[in-house]
């Protein structure tokens, strides 16, 4: 963004404002197991450099959630409009006839089976993978007929890399000998149609996150009619109203997570209203075609002639 204004002086520039890193109240230092180093503190400032320069030059910005917008310094907030990227609720919807086949294990699962799901771009602490994995041994013991479907790669999208092994390898070394591998299925990264089928057969869907960017996957799970058990962290609380359209648990409380998932699996019929409310929330607030895209187009199409004229003079000033 550094020279966009110089190259396109008449353009309306809209920045995508996903997240502004801070040392307090967000992801930094949230998880004591992965305490930040001095270098991590420097990284916070470095991560914000390009955004700060871009926000000075842009006409407007969009941020997906109110909480993410609140991460920005006050000097920029008046420029940033809260509007989500949007969820395609036409294609992402409940289907109780869906099936997911695991050919390597000669297994097909449907919504009539007991299926616990977890999804993240990568399996890492920022998305609570370590908390989920440590809860699995007891959860599987309590739910002897449950299958666990885990979607995600072995890289690191956020946070710190481990030396010499992945977080999945690290957690399997810790708890793997207490897991029934005939019932715990690591699916890797899936084509979207298969990922959707996993959500559609889910009995209980676990979504945990640091106070950080809200994942599309949580909203997609809600749109698909999942009972989402989410961490009671700020980005999740903005969307999930506990016991109305989802269930909230303390990010670090494995006992609460186990008991909540167990309760959902034991009493499926009692959570049908939550499934319906979850989908309604996404349709009414985050639908791509009817809600988010019109707002995005409105922001893009606004003309700000005074701002454009003032920045047109900027390149001349640089010549002297």
Segments predicted by a language model, with ranges:
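Acceptor-binding helix/loop patch of EC 2.4 sugar-transfer enzymes
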Residues: 11-49, 90-99, 111, 153-165, ...
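Conserved donor-binding/catalytic core segment of Leloir-type glycosyltransferases
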Residues: 105-127, 133-138, 149
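Nucleotide-activated donor-binding/catalytic signature segment of Leloir-type glycosyltransferases, i.e.
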Residues: 156, 162-189, 193
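Aromatic "clamp/platform" in nucleotide-sugar-dependent glycosyltransferases that forms part
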Residues: 210
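Short hydrophobic beta-strand element within catalytic cores of glycosyltransferases
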Residues: 227-230, 240
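Conserved acidic donor-binding segment of nucleotide-sugar-dependent glycosyltransferases
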Residues: 242-243, 247-254, 263-268
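A short, well-ordered alpha-helix in the C-terminal region of glycosyltransferases
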Residues: 256, 263, 270-285, 291, ...
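C-terminal alpha-helical cap of glycosyltransferases
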Residues: 288-320
């Amino acid at each position: 963004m550094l020279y966009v204004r110089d190259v396109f002086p008449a353009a309306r520039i809209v920045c995508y404002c996903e997240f502004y890193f801070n040392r307090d109240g967000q992801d930094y230092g949230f998880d004591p197991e992965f305490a930040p180093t001095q270098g991590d503190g420097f990284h916070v400032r470095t991560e914000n450099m390009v955004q700060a320069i871009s926000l000075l030059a842009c006409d407007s910005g969009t941020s997906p959630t109110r909480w993410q917008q609140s991460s920005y310094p006050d000097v920029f907030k008046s420029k940033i409009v809260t509007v989500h990227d949007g969820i395609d609720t036409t294609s992402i919807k409940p289907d109780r006839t869906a099936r997911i086949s695991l050919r390597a294990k000669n297994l097909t699962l449907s919504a009539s089976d007991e299926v616990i799901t977890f999804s993240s771009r990568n399996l890492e602490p920022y998305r609570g993978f370590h908390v989920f994995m440590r809860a699995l041994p007891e959860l599987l013991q309590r739910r002897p007929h449950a299958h666990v479907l885990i979607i995600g790669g072995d890289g690191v999208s956020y946070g710190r890399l481990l030396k010499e092994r992945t977080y999945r390898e690290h957690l399997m070394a810790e708890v793997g000998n207490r897991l029934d591998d005939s019932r715990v299925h690591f699916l890797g990264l899936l084509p979207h149609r298969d990922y959707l089928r996993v959500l559609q057969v889910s009995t209980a869907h676990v979504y945990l996150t640091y106070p950080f960017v809200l994942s599309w996957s949580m909203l997609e799970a809600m749109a698909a009619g999942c009972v989402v058990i989410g961490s009671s962290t700020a980005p999740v609380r903005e969307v999930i109203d506990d016991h109305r359209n989802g269930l909230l648990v303390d990010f670090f409380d494995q006992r609460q997570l186990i008991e909540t998932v167990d309760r959902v699996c034991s009493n499926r019929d009692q959570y049908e209203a939550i499934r319906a409310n979850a989908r309604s929330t996404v349709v009414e607030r985050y639908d791509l075609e009817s809600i988010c895209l019109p707002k995005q187009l409105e922001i893009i199409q606004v003309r700000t002639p005074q701002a454009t004229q003032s920045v047109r003079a900027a390149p001349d000033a640089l010549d002297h």
